[in-house]
Amino acid sequence: MSDRRPDRGRHQARKRAVDLLFEAEARGLTAAEVATSRNKLAGTQPDVTALNPYTVTVARGVTDHRDHIDDLISAHLQGWTLDRLPAVDRAILRVAVWELLHAEDVPEPVAVDEAVELAKQLSTDDSPGFVNGVLGQVMLVTPQIRAASQAVRESAQGPSEG
């Protein structure tokens, strides 16, 4: 029987990213600021461990794309607004949507499965189904969003010489 989650390091990194987003929101900071602060502290305090590089990547990615991520989540909430969601659910959804849009090495089903698993571990009994439903809707539009982003990047680079 194969392990459903062969990369426990990534799972823990995602969980830590959710923790950082939750903490950042509570403190009125960005996730990138909290990650930077934590890693600086790890450099001076022997009892503080540096963050997994993937946690930092996710924190910075969510910070850089937060408005777009929140707009996309909000567009797929039915009967809810983003600010009415439990803070942990917002953090889980933000991590997962960032992965769906920007983590090219993470298959879409893995991003969704990981988010659902985090919702089971960290949130209410209703959250896993809710998170799965929202991300299922977001997954329907991610190919178009990724293609549009790629086209913008290519046009910004200008015509290739050849």
Curated annotation (Swiss-Prot):
The source's superkingdom equals: Bacteria
Q: Where are the transmembrane segments?
A: none
* Keywords recorded for this protein, A-Z: RNA-binding, Transcription, Transcription antitermination, Transcription regulation
> What does the record list as GO biological process?
DNA-templated transcription termination; transcription antitermination
What Gene Ontology terms describe where this protein resides (cellular component)? Answer: cytosol
Q: Where is the signal peptide?
A: none
Q: Report if keyword Ligase is assigned.
A: no
Q: What does this protein do?
A: Involved in transcription antitermination. Required for transcription of ribosomal RNA (rRNA) genes. Binds specifically to the boxA antiterminator sequence of the ribosomal RNA (rrn) operons.
Under which name does UniProt file this protein? Transcription antitermination protein NusB
Species source reads: Mycobacterium sp. (strain KMS)
